[in-house]
Curated annotation (Swiss-Prot):
Its cofactor is K(+). Gene3D superfamilies: P-loop containing nucleotide triphosphate hydrolases, Probable tRNA modification gtpase trme, domain 1, tRNA modification GTPase MnmE domain 2. One of its GO terms (molecular function) is GTP binding. The keyword Metal-binding applies. GO terms for biological process: tRNA methylation; tRNA wobble uridine modification. It is an enzyme of class 3 (hydrolase). Homodimer. Heterotetramer of two MnmE and two MnmG subunits. This is tRNA modification GTPase MnmE. Its main location: cytoplasm. Exhibits a very high intrinsic GTPase hydrolysis rate. Involved in the addition of a carboxymethylaminomethyl (cmnm) group at the wobble position (U34) of certain tRNAs, forming tRNA-cmnm(5)s(2)U34. K(+) binds at residues 232, 251, 253, 256. It comes from the Bacteria. The lineage of its organism: Bacteria, Bacillati, Bacillota, Bacilli, Lactobacillales.
Amino acid sequence: MSITKEFDTITAISTPLGEGAIGIVRLSGTDAIAIANKVFKGKNLETVDSHTINYGHIVENNEIIDEVMVSVMRAPKTFTREDVVEVNTHGGVAVTNEILQLLIRSGARMAEPGEFTKRAFLNGRIDLTQAEAVMDLIRAKTDKAMTVAVSQLDGSLKNLINNTRQEILNTLAQVEVNIDYPEYDDVEEVTTNLVREKTQEFQALLENLLATAKRGKILREGLSTAIIGRPNVGKSSLLNNLLREEKAIVTDIEGTTRDVIEEYVNIKGVPLKLIDTAGIRDTDDVVEKIGVERSKKALEEADLVLLVLNSSEPLTDQDRTLLDISQNSNRIILLNKTDLPQAIQTEELPEDLIPISVLKNENIDKIEDRINQLFFDNAGLVEKDATYLSNARHISLIEKALESLEAVNQGLELGMPVDLLQVDMTRTWEILGEITGDAAPDELITQLFSQFCLGK
């Protein structure tokens, strides 16, 4: 997809294919209204007011294809800042595809993935962070993830980055003035102090922003959570309890879960990617052995480990092995089967364990509370009006910007002339511009929009 502005008219189906109450076919471009008008029988769309919905029929050769409502929105007050038409049809694969093909035959071009959002970016309606927020909003798995995406779409990150870039420019301009038109005998010292003060200010701001990355990444991608334990301690039953549906096979036969099962669940706004692992033990079964190896790998990569022990049986060597290999992880130890007489030796266990009964659904809510304590310091997940980093691209660029600012600091410590340090500060300004798209390479922008679905 070319990064250059294109002014032809594009079209695509904007609703999921399949049976449904309605389908929407969208057009955007200079000829959007004229093309829609060619196939619409009703009011003259070229003369109706902007932002109106018009009843009529889509026809070809006087044959009615569907009864529709057509929305007409004139530039620049549209998502793309171009003329936009949305044809609201009855849902279904055949009718939406037929109308799409008719619009293409009438002069529109099939849109590429993300091209509507790309045009909104190229026409200056949104920046790159807001474009990425559109995708985050589509993919949000919980209300908290949605809140963060909406905040970014509303411009919270864009405004913070743009304000910081402007402050950097102001600092660079003041340095230039001080160097070219010195008003004081100690102008070099004054300029050095200015650069030092501003550099520390920018560092503090970006470090605070970077500190939100852990929380933001969890909201965007989910908290990878491995459920581990020896066979038949209730791992799959716990998974089903958290999911509140039967997703894993639960039996009384040891070794039933022979692979790794992954599911997402919303725990108080946190999207947990639950990984139910095969019981980790020595086995001669080839299939089960593969599952055990995958379980060990899942344990290494997990953000959180839920270690399930059977409180109705004494600790086994397998239990002790699991306690040992998971001790450096963010771990919650769960004593399951508290509905049965206790036989486990609790003196060998850490004090912060949680007794539960998956069978009777007892103390499951305490797992949720402990997760909040472990990852969010009981402070709540999303603070009102806060800006969060959740995108790996943004995080990487903020880290690079901080490296450039640190280079300025090191130069100051070494007594380097301030005019030489302008290079690193200018580099910081450029890196931050890559976040918003002001200085992003064409190839990057093209690649980002190609990840969108058709019609968005």
